[in-house]
Amino acid sequence: MKREDINMSAQNLTLLTDLYELTMMQGYFETQENQTVVFDVFFRDNPNKGGYSVMAGLDQVIDYIKNLNFSYEDVDYLRGLGLFSEDFLHYLSGFHFSGDIYAIPEGSVIFPREPLLKVVAPIMEAQLVETAILTILNHQCLIATKASRVVYAAQGDGIMEFGLRRAQGPDAGLYGARAAVIGGCVGTSNVLAGEMFDVPIMGTHAHSWIMTFKDEYTAFKEYARLYPDACTLLVDTYDTLKSGVPNAIRVFTEMRDAGIKPKSYGIRLDSGDLAYLSKKARKMLDDAGFQDAVIAASNDLDEFLIHDLKMQGAAISSWGVGTNLITSKDCPSFGGVYKLAAIQNADGEFQPKIKISENIEKITNPGNKTIYRIYDKETGMLRADLICFADETFNTGEDLLLFDPNATWKKTLLPGGTYTMRELLVPIFQHGECKYESPSVKEIAEFCRQEKETLWDETKRLFNPHKVYVDLSQKLYDTKTKLLNEAHH
């Protein structure tokens, strides 16, 4: 089956928008205000007070933009609302996206206030796509970030995404699984996600399997007969240490005596004191000669519980994480926003626009912008991100002064030749045509792993992480200050 045949995002989701996007579109249409504008997608805070986030969802955004068109049924439905003129509905019937989109590639580490995605398009088009872009990026960035935190807590152990049945619907389960693999999960229990995104699928069996048979030993024996190369047995249906683990050892012994060498085998704990039970089970398995048997665990895990279990010396090397990962239960929203940044004038120049707020964190950065990531040349570690105007250039052979835009006295001078720079925003659509070839999910996940290696451990830690600075160029800072001053006079 072709990917596009099963990809839910390849459906026509044109009406996946808020009503006010359409009423504003009609307003622009009627007043003939359809100048080219720049909108930025950004977020203000990392989830869970973390040190970074992970970019995900761009591939679904691409599919959404490619399939933008108002069907006959869409137009007829809108006509029935009694809100829209026939001239405007006629315009919608021939609608297609003709603008440009730039974005940070999926798997990148990202930070608050920097543009993740930039839309440069006639305002009617740019306004329409706001809602869908936000719902896609807000969801997948959130889950990829959560997965990355869980993976970090596991200290190299494998994390399996097990959350489909607790996800907020099929779409969240599917694209949440995709995002989780991008964030570092080794696989998912979600079979359709495996088919759609070519990611590993994995799982064991439920308590119902054991309860169906006359006893636990028989259930284990039959499962091992059916799946000898991937035999992980759930040992807590009746009594973990008195029944489950001994019966698992009995089956593993019979397999060994029969000359069967599984590619992977072990037990799964799904309840009780996981630290205590895993250490006891580990000793029982080791004493029986099964030192290479894996102990997996599940049971409402998250990064904090896994961190705590690791601190207690739990003998667990594989973790199934469901509800708390697929829903990001303790931080259920990402907070991405879509703000106007510039309007093109009659001369083709972009005039910076700024949104002002009493809350300093809600004041936007004006203009048609891009981002440069700055690395230490010797170590390759990330030093800072620099937001600047899209037409600004830099010479890495020259000194670069970085400063905190909210506390300008905090400054860092990078001597010329000691740093490198990489532009983060890449062209995705040009004049309505997709110019970007999305990597596979496996490639994105590997890129994400490499990205996180450029972060200091102090930034990745779960508690009180070190902040990565996102600074403004002097030119952008001066423009922002000028606009703020003008607005208050």
Regions found by a protein language model. Give the residues of each.
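Ordered alpha/beta subdomains of enzyme catalytic regions
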Residues: 1-229, 256-257, 263, 339-489
